[in-house]
Amino acid sequence: MRTFVTKLLGLFLVVLAAIAIGAAGSSQAAVVSYFANLSGPNESPPNASPGTGTGAVDVDATAHTMHVHAVFSGLLGNTTASHIHAPTAAPGTGTAGVATTTPTFAGFPLGVMAGTYDITLDMTLASSYNPSYVTANGGTTASAEAALFQSIADGKAYLNIHSNVFPGGEIRGFLIPLATPTTATSWGRIKSLYR
């Protein structure tokens, strides 16, 4: 009898944990994270800059925000601008106009060869976009947000850091989705604890 009660209690805890994970997953489902490996060879055309960097972008369609974080070093020139370009004609290749703030992200470290940047943009504000991007994508911030988030999801957006040596961009990287655990994989992990 005690074994049956223990198993029943264990099953109850598994179900309770699955419900909690499902609730946590659904409350965070709107946030999607992307990563970019920034380098000169990723530019179009490629360049020989020894500069490197990483970018992380979290888009939240529910909160209408986009968090941008970048770390870079080893540039040959001093930074002049940074922003996200979108959409390219094909995923992972080509060039596109500036989609986000022009001439650069607010507060981006300019005149340096290495730095760190972190900002959360309110995507309901026109100041988060290049005005021509808004015009080309329906004329409202809502339509521009939808277009930009879709371009990022489609692999047609890249983070670019420009310098005085490479005005068209010294290092860039296309935004690719980060692998995130799903409710199904979390449920599988919970079940494996009781096998």
Model-based region annotation:
Residues 5, 140, 185-186:
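Secondary-structure junction/capping motif
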Residues 178-186, 195:
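Intrinsically disordered, low-complexity regulatory segments in eukaryotic proteins
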Residues 25-179:
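N-terminal leader/targeting pre-sequences
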Residues 2-13:
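Bacterial N-terminal signal peptides that target proteins for export
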